[in-house]
């Protein structure tokens, strides 16, 4: 279901000069005990970003997942990029979240960085559902203009592919524009806010339960704190 999206994301990263980085030991790939599920992850070094992670879970008709978060270098104060795509094949259910994840919540920051996402929100009405995400506070590390959908096969096949492509294009444009506009948040504060994002997300990550059900608690806890949100595991 999501392999074309994965290929497009990796092609974009590579075209931008991205090179593979080492995933923590034992976390690059894991198979479920029954062999029905496999999860693979990649870590990228990309110019302008201190960390870019990608994860793909394939559990056949039961579940398909694509997740990615891009952390800009501390010298940039623009939003993180967040992608969460889940497909439950047996139920023909799509959950999609595409967002520029803001470091702070204020109008000046939104005016500076969110014109592109606002335009996408208008362009793809199937993915601007007003239903609030249940596991997260939309007023912290999420924007009001995220592309969000709890839909079905129609959205997965018709709305999501062009929205995903446009979303990546808009985020690259955001990053390119930020190169020419000095950050208004100091680098040490950006570092603190990105670390807080990891802590906040690890406490609320709705995918952790899914990973645990497929790959066990011990591996999934390590994956959560060492790969997905590494700052959450620091004392």
UniProtKB/Swiss-Prot annotation:
Catalyzed reactions per annotation: 15,16-dihydrobiliverdin + oxidized 2[4Fe-4S]-[ferredoxin] = biliverdin IXalpha + reduced 2[4Fe-4S]-[ferredoxin] + 2 H(+)
GO terms, biological process: phytochromobilin biosynthetic process
InterPro entries linked: DiHydbiliverdin_OxRdtase, Ferredoxin-dep_bilin_Rdtase
Signal peptide residues on this chain, from the entry's feature table: none
Lineage: Bacteria, Bacillati, Cyanobacteriota, Cyanophyceae, Synechococcales
UniProt KW Lyase keyword: no
Keywords: Oxidoreductase
Name of the molecule in the record: 15,16-dihydrobiliverdin:ferredoxin oxidoreductase
Domain of life: Bacteria
Protein's job: Catalyzes the two-electron reduction of biliverdin IX-alpha at the C15 methine bridge.
């Amino acid at each position: 279901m999501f392999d074309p999206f994965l290929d497009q994301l990796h092609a974009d990263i590579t075209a931008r000069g991205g090179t593979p980085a080492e995933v923590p030991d034992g976390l690059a790939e894991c198979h479920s005990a029954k062999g029905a599920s496999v999860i693979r992850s990649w870590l990228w070094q990309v110019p302008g970003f201190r960390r870019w992670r990608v994860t793909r879970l394939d559990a056949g008709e039961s579940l398909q997942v694509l997740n990615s978060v891009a952390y800009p270098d501390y010298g940039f104060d623009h939003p993180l990029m967040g992608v969460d795509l889940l497909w439950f094949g047996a139920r023909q259910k799509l959950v999609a979240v595409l967002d520029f994840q803001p470091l702070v919540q204020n109008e000046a920051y939104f005016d500076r960085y969110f014109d592109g996402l606002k335009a996408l929100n208008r362009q793809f009405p199937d993915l601007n559902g007003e239903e609030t995400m249940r596991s997260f506070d939309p007023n912290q590390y999420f924007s009001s203009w995220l592309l969000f959908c709890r839909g079905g096969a129609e959205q997965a096949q018709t709305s999501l592919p062009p929205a995903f492509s446009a979303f990546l294009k808009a985020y690259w444009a955001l990053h390119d524009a930020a190169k020419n506009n000095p950050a208004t948040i100091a680098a040490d504060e950006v570092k603190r806010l990105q670390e807080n994002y990891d802590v906040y997300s690890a406490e609320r990550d709705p995918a952790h339960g899914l990973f645990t059900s497929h790959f066990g608690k011990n591996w999934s806890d390590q994956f959560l704190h060492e790969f997905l949100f590494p700052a959450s595991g620091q004392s």
